[in-house]
Every structure is written in C-alpha cells, then in structure tokens.
Amino acid sequence: MSTYRRVLLKLSGESLGGPAGKGIDEKWLAAYAEEVAEAVKNGLQVAIVIGGGNIFRGLQGVGKGFDRVNGDKLGMLATVINSLGLAMAIRSAGVEAEVFTATPMMPVARYYMRDDAV
C-alpha cells in the first residue's frame, strides 16, 4: 500500500490519441481507465488533469486565422471532451468518476467548487 492517499495524475491529451497523437484511441483510453480504477480499488483517491492537444491546440489556431482567445477556448473544450471520455471509461472499469470544469457547462460537467471536489 502506498504512503499516499491522494494523487494527481497529469495526462497529455496527445497521449489519448495513441501512436498518432490525434483523436481518441479507445485502447489507450481503456488502458488509462484500468490503471486508474486499480489505484482507486487499492484505496487511492485520484484526481486527473488532462489536456486537449489531441483535438485542438489554441496556438495552432492562431496560425490558421483564429484569434488567440477563441483558439484557447476551442482548446478548453477539447479538454472537456477528453475528460468526458476518460470519465466514461473509468466508470466502465467499475469506479465512480466526476468531471469538473472552471467554466459552467451544465449539464455537460459540474462547475468546479473546491468543497465539492475535495
């Protein structure tokens, strides 16, 4: 048993895309979910921060005519898409999962409030 009760896992969005680094590769998603589920079943509380680079990067949009702010907004939505996919995979592995966002997006995800997340 680990000496830690809570861990933070940072995943690159590109890692969900498998070898190509694009889109969502279901095999990689399931593999991450199984690892997280195993950790939770062994008594760990796991928080996950995930990127959205497999879908869209704000800086890439600037080179394609997007202004930086709207490009970053697209990147944030990509992060939510990845979060929802990973949460579904974790639930399929038999563990509860919740998606929180700093921007209200009901009913897509819960608005982050510290007391709800801890």
Region annotations inferred by a language model:
Residues 1-47:
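N-terminal glycine-/serine-/threonine-rich phosphate-binding loop
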Residues 10, 18, 50, 68, ...:
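A generic, residue-level signal for flexible/boundary positions that often mark functional hotspots
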Residues 38-40, 45-46, 52-59, 74-77:
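N-terminal active-site beta-alpha-beta segment that forms phosphate/nucleotide-binding
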